[in-house]
Amino acid sequence: RMLSPQVPLLRFAHIDGEHSYDGVYSDLQLAQRYLAPGGLIVLDDIFNMNSACCTHALFDYLRDHPLVHCVAMGYRKAYLCESRWLGFYRKFFLETPDLLGAAGIHVRLCFNAWANERSYVTFDDCGADEPHYQIIGRRFHTLKETLGTLDHAS
């Protein structure tokens, strides 16, 4: 409360702090408290075997705060936003392979469920000639083809 008048709202918060369960959970609470509308929280060391508490705290935090969603995971980071901004960030992450590909950085975006609108996406490196999209093991070369497959599965 003492900080509230002095601390500006954050559009982007990257958490890479003390890696205990309580420390991570507290950092998430603090980041959300000062997050500007439309802001993004990025939590480091997700699924890192040396920092398992980060992943545990993340999933508990998401369970306890239903208006916060994980929109994407990749490179040991989780990307969180408020539910009302989920569509905005999903659109951004869907375009990530094309945006980064133009710069010579190749990533594969993976849909982790057939229910496109309810799932977070994950991403990781891939080769320039490899498919840049995937739905539970099935790979696709274009976003249009991927979304078409998801539409037919619904």
Residue ranges and their predicted role:
Residues 1-51:
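Active-site segment flanking the S-adenosylmethionine/decSAM binding pocket
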